[in-house]
């Protein structure tokens, strides 16, 4: 009589993996319904239906651990259970990283924190799976089985998981984002495919969903991308460059301040394992070209010659759906190349007759004249810090990372996403407007104090009736308090921020203090 090779529990764990998959699909449905029924950016008086990140992670951890130990009688049964649960998390992990998100009114970056923590949870569960199986083999005096092909493949998969976690930590990701992205992308495909040959019983149904999500993302990029040639590049100063593309690459209308993603042409094999670069469109739909205002970085866009080909896809909206329909008073903070986001916003507000004001922070005055003529009658305060970020002195702002066009995403560690430069940009300060900055130079600090409270009466140096220059740095809280004296009807009052993290954070704090709505540039990819 033949003895069953795996015992009665060989297929018992399949249902637990299926249960995690069903829960994952329900979570996706919840996010979709939530974003359809609740604005992405709300007035403070409206109820927030979002679960805090820590609570979501805690619930997932409790769910996975609970299912890993329930009705378990043998060590190897627990080992198998945790292995299947680890792989069952992959469909949701992959889905949360798809860009652009297929969910309605969903910014891809808003899903990345949960993606990151579920990935860490999956790695932890994978470690438990490996440790339990190792203990089982040792107890049975069968350690040699670790080196069987299908079992040793599991050891390699676990090692790849650990590499993905280590390279995703801030100290690595911030400094070598391109390498992190390549490792992450190739490792995800390896884990998804290799587990097919490692897992017993098979994981075909789970792999179907992983392959569907990853494959559809690739297919979208192929279908949505177009190969275009640069019309011109022009230096606006040492830190800013203007790049133009033919107007025909975008539809007749797009929402102002939308962004596109740029990469090497798809004919280049490296483009498939490299991250794309998001750039905000600084021109308006009515202009006869597509303009980007960028910083010179390792990605060759700023220095590319006319006629150089790139792959472009988009545009993707960055502003909330109801911004232009609800706004009646808007304060915009921009840092450096963040003007690429602010410029089309204030131009559109001016045409619509909506009250607005711009605060732009720069290291030096180079390139300002290129923008002044397009500001029209927009009330503008321009702050010149006068310091080089690399000197480590004075009031500084972080040189914007490659590909972000000087704009940031969110404050939930999202400043680390989409940042492509691999060395000096990642080491710079991003605390431009920190209230407790202790390293400000005397001149800059004096300039800041001299201008404090004078934003409404021409400041330190008046350039025109609408543009005022200041030395030093602004105080967003004071500027916002003075601009939003009337605190009634907060639904129509907005603060927008685009620039280094310090600027975004202090602008958001000012919005909370004054009770108005807040939005910062977030790539909906």
UniProtKB/Swiss-Prot annotation:
GO terms for biological process: reductive iron assimilation. Residues 82-194 form the Ferric oxidoreductase domain. InterPro entries: FAD-bd_8 (IPR013112), Fe3_Rdtase_TM_dom (IPR013130), Fe_red_NAD-bd_6 (IPR013121), Ferric/Cupric_Reductase (IPR051410), FNR_nucleotide-bd (IPR039261). It is found in: Membrane. Residues 407-478 are annotated as: Disordered. Its EC number is 1.16.1.-. The keyword Amino-acid biosynthesis does not apply. The chain crosses the membrane at residues 13-33, 52-72, 82-102, 118-138, 152-172, 179-199, 203-223. It is an enzyme of class 1 (oxidoreductase). It is a multi-pass membrane protein. The keyword NADP applies. CDD domains: NOX_Duox_like_FAD_NADP. Residues 410-438 have a biased composition (Acidic residues). Keywords: Electron transport, FAD, Flavoprotein, Ion transport, Membrane, NADP, Oxidoreductase, Transmembrane, Transmembrane helix, Transport. One of its GO terms (cellular component) is plasma membrane. Belongs to the ferric reductase (FRE) family. AIM14 subfamily. This is Probable metalloreductase AIM14. The lineage of its organism: Eukaryota, Fungi, Dikarya, Ascomycota, Saccharomycotina. The gene is AIM14.
């Amino acid at each position: 009589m033949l003895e069953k090779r795996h015992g009665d529990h060989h297929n018992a764990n399949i249902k637990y993996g299926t249960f995690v998959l069903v829960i994952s699909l329900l979570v996706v449905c919840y996010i979709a319904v939530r974003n359809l029924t609740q604005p992405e950016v709300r007035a403070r008086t409206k109820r927030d239906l979002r679960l805090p990140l820590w609570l979501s992670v805690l619930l997932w951890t409790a769910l996975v651990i609970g299912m890993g130990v329930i009705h378990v009688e043998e060590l190897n049964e627990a080992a198998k259970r945790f292995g299947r649960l680890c792989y069952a998390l992959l469909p949701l992990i992959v889905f949360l990283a798809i860009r652009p998100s297929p969910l309605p009114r969903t910014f891809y970056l808003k899903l990345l924190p949960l993606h990151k923590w579920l990935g860490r949870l999956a790695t932890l569960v994978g470690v438990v799976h490996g440790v339990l199986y190792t203990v089982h083999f040792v107890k049975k005096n069968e350690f040699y089985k670790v080196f069987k092909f299908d079992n040793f493949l599991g050891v390699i998969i676990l090692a790849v998981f650990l590499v993905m976690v280590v390279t995703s930590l801030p100290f690595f990701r911030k400094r070598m984002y391109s390498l992190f992205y390549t490792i992450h992308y190739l490792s995800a495909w390896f884990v998804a495919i290799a587990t097919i040959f490692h897992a017993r019983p098979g994981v075909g149904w789970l792999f179907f969903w992983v392959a569907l999500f990853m494959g559809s993302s690739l297919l979208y990029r192929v279908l949505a991308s177009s190969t275009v040639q640069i019309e011109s590049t022009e230096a606006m100063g040492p830190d800013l460059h203007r790049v133009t593309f033919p107007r025909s690459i975008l539809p007749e209308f797009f929402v102002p301040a939308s962004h596109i993603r740029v990469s090497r042409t798809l004919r280049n094999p490296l483009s498939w394992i490299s991250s794309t670069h998001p750039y905000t469109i600084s021109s308006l739909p009515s202009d006869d070209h597509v303009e980007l205002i960028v910083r010179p970085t390792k990605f060759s866009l700023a220095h590319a010659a006319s006629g150089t080909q790139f792959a472009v896809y988009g545009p993707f909206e960055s502003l909330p759906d109801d911004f232009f329909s609800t706004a009646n008073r808007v304060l915009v903070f921009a840092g450096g190349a963040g003007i690429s986001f602010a410029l089309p916003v204030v131009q559109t507000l001016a045409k619509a007759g909506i009250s607005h004001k711009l605060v732009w922070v720069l290291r030096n005055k180079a390139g300002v004249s290129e923008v002044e003529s397009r500001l029209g009658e927009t009330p503008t305060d321009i702050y010149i810090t006068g310091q080089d970020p690399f000197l480590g002195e004075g009031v500084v702002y972080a040189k914007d990372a490659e590909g972000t066009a000087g704009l940031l995403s969110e404050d939930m560690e999202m400043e680390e996403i989409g940042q492509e430069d691999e060395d000096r940009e990642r080491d710079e300060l991003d605390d431009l407007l920190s209230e407790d900055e202790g390293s400000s130079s005397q001149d800059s600090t004096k300039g800041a104090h001299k201008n404090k409270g004078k934003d409404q009466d021409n400041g330190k140096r008046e350039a025109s009736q609408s543009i005022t220059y200041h030395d030093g740095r602004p105080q967003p809280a004071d500027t916002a308090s003075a601009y939003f004296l009337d605190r009634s009807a907060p639904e129509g009052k907005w603060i927008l921020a685009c620039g280094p993290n310090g600027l975004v954070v202090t602008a958001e704090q000012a919005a909370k203090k004054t009770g108005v709505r807040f939005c910062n540039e977030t790539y909906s990819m």
